[in-house]
C-alpha cells in the first residue's frame, strides 16, 4: 500500500494535487480531515522517526531517528540533549492537519543536519485543537502551553530552538512568540517586550504564513480562484475558527496581527526565513510584512519566492518535476540557516552569561590585583562550553530491550544498531 501511495504522490500532476487540496479544504470538517490525513499519512519507513505524546503538557509528536524504539522518558531525554530543536506547528486552515503531515521534509532536515554538520536535531511537532470544535484562542493556547513546557518545563534553552510554521501554523507561530514575549502588542501596538527572563529563540521558519485576516489585497483578487486557499476556505475560517459574526472583530487579537509593522525584535528571533509563492493569495500580505522587517534592519531575513501556489515549500506535490531540485536546494538552505542561527544564538548566550558573571563579581567580590580569579562554573556554563559538533553520550549509550524480531536499521545510514550479546541489549549510536 505504501508503494502505491508513493507512486501517487510522485506522479500526480501538480494541478490535480492543487485542485484536490482546494476542494478538500472546503469540505465539512470530518471529510476534509480524512482526505488530508490519507494524503499526508507517514509512510512505513518514516514511522521509525515518530514518538507520539498526549499528556497534560502537550499533544503532538517527537520526530528523530529511531524514536520508535524509545519510551517517553528516553524520547524526552533525547529532545533535551539535541543540538537543535525545531518547534513545528502545522498548517491546514485551523480545521485540518496533524503533527506528522510533512514527514518527507522532516526526515530530509534531520538527515542533512546529521550528515552535513554531524549534529543531532529533534522536531517537536504540535497537535493543536482543530476548528470548529476548538475555536480561537484555544489552538493558540495549546501552542503557547507546549512552548512553555519545552522552555520552562524541560529547560530547553531558546538559543537552540527554531520555530517553524506554515500557513495557519505560521500565524500560530507568530502569535505564540507574541504571547510569550510581548503579550500586550495586539492590544497596544506600541507595547514593549515584557518577558526578558528567557532569550528569544534562535530562528523562525515561516512558509506561506497567514499574517492578515483581511482578504482585500491584489493577490487575493488575482488568485482566489486558482490557489489552494480559496474564498470558501476563508469564510469557513471566519465562521468555524474565529466564530464570526457571533464574536466581535474587536475581541479577536489575531485580526490585528497585520497592524504590527515595527519593532519586530520585541518578539521575533534574530534570524527569520520566509517562503512564499508568487501565485498565492497570501503573497501581498507576506511581502508587506517582509518589507517592514527589512526596513527596520534588525533581523537577518532570508526571503524566498518561487512561481508556485500556497505552501509549495512544505507541500512538495505542488512543485513540477522539472523544479523538484528546488526542494532539495531549499531544504539544504534551511538546514544551513538553522545551524548558523543556533551558533549565533549560543555565542550570544555565552557572552551574556559571561557578562552577567562579571557584573555579579564586581558587585559582591573584592578583587586583589595579584589574585587569580576562579568563577564557579554553573550547569549552563558547562553546557555552553560544549562543542556544537561533539557527540552526546546520551545518543551513544541508550539501552533498549531487544525486540522480538531484530531488524537492522535501514532508515539512516549514519545510525546503526548493534546487539550487545553479553548484556542482551541493543545500543543506538
Where are these regions (language model features)?
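Short, surface-exposed "cap/lid" segments of acyl-processing enzymes
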Residues: 69-112
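Alpha/beta-hydrolase active-site loop signature
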Residues: 93, 129-132, 211, 309
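Gly/Ala-rich beta-loop-alpha elbow adjacent to hydrolase catalytic centers
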Residues: 165, 169
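Fungal intrinsically disordered, low-complexity serine/threonine- and proline-rich regulatory regions
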Residues: 351-429
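Catalytic nucleophile-loop/oxyanion-hole region of alpha/beta-hydrolase
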Residues: 98, 105, 121-160
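Alpha/beta hydrolase fold serine-hydrolase catalytic domain that processes acyl esters and thioesters
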Residues: 141, 153-162, 175-365, 415, ...
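Short, well-ordered amphipathic alpha-helices
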Residues: 62-68, 104-114, 144-151, 173-191, ...
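A glycine/proline-hinged amphipathic helix-loop "lid/cap" segment
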Residues: 1-78, 248-249, 350-379, 385
Amino acid at each position: 500500500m505504501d508503494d502505491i501511495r508513493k507512486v501517487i504522490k510522485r506522479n500526480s500532476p501538480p494541478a490535480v494535487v492543487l485542485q484536490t487540496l482546494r476542494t478538500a479544504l472546503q469540505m465539512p470538517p470530518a471529510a476534509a480531515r480524512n482526505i488530508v490525513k490519507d494524503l499526508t499519512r507517514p509512510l512505513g519507513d518514516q514511522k521509525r522517526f515518530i514518538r507520539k505524546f498526549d499528556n497534560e503538557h502537550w499533544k503532538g509528536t517527537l520526530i528523530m531517528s529511531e524514536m520508535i524504539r524509545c519510551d517517553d522518558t528516553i524520547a524526552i531525554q533525547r529532545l533535551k540533549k539535541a543540538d537543535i530543536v525545531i518547534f513545528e506547528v502545522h498548517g491546514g486552515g485551523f480545521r485540518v492537519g496533524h503533527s506528522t503531515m510533512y514527514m518527507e521534509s522532516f526526515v530530509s532536515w534531520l538527515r542533512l543536519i546529521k550528515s552535513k554538520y554531524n549534529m543531532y536535531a529533534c522536531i517537536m511537532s504540535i497537535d493543536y485543537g482543530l476548528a470548529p470544535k476548538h475555536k480561537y484562542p484555544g489552538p493558540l493556547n495549546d501552542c503557547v502551553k507546549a512552548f512553555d513546557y519545552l522552555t520552562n518545563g524541560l529547560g530547553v534553552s531558546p538559543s537552540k530552538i527554531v520555530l517553524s510554521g506554515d500557513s495557519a501554523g505560521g500565524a500560530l507561530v507568530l502569535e505564540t512568540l507574541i504571547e510569550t514575549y510581548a503579550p500586550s502588542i495586539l492590544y497596544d501596538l506600541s507595547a514593549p517586550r515584557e518577558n526578558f527572563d528567557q532569550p528569544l529563540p534562535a530562528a523562525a521558519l515561516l512558509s506561506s504564513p497567514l499574517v492578515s485576516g483581511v482578504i482585500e489585497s491584489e493577490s487575493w483578487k488575482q488568485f482566489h480562484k486558482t490557489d489552494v486557499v480559496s474564498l470558501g476556505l476563508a469564510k469557513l475560517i471566519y465562521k468555524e475558527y474565529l466564530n464570526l459574526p457571533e464574536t466581535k472583530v474587536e475581541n479577536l487579537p489575531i485580526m490585528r496581527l497585520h497592524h504590527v509593522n515595527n519593532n519586530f525584535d520585541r518578539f521575533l528571533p534574530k534570524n527569520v526565513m520566509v517562503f512564499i509563492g508568487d501565485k498565492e493569495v497570501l503573497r501581498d500580505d507576506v511581502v508587506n510584512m517582509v518589507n517592514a522587517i527589512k526596513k527596520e534592519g534588525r533581523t537577518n531575513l532570508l526571503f524566498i519566492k518561487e512561481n508556485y501556489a500556497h505552501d509549495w515549500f512544505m507541500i512538495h506535490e505542488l512543485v513540477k518535476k522539472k523544479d523538484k531540485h528546488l526542494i532539495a536546494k531549499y531544504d539544504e538552505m534551511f538546514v544551513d540557516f538553522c545551524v548558523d542561527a543556533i551558533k549565533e544564538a549560543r555565542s550570544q548566550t555565552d557572552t551574556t552569561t559571561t557578562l552577567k558573571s562579571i557584573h555579579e563579581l564586581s558587585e559582591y567580590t573584592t578583587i586583589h590585583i595579584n589574585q587569580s580569579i576562579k568563577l564557579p562554573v554553573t550547569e549552563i556554563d558547562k553546557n555552553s562550553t560544549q562543542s556544537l559538533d561533539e557527540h552526546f553520550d546520551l545518543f551513544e549509550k541508550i539501552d533498549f530491550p531487544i525486540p522480538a524480531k531484530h531488524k537492522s536499521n535501514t532508515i539512516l545510514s549514519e545510525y546503526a544498531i548493534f546487539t550487545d550479546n553479553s548484556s542482551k541489549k541493543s545500543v543506538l549510536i
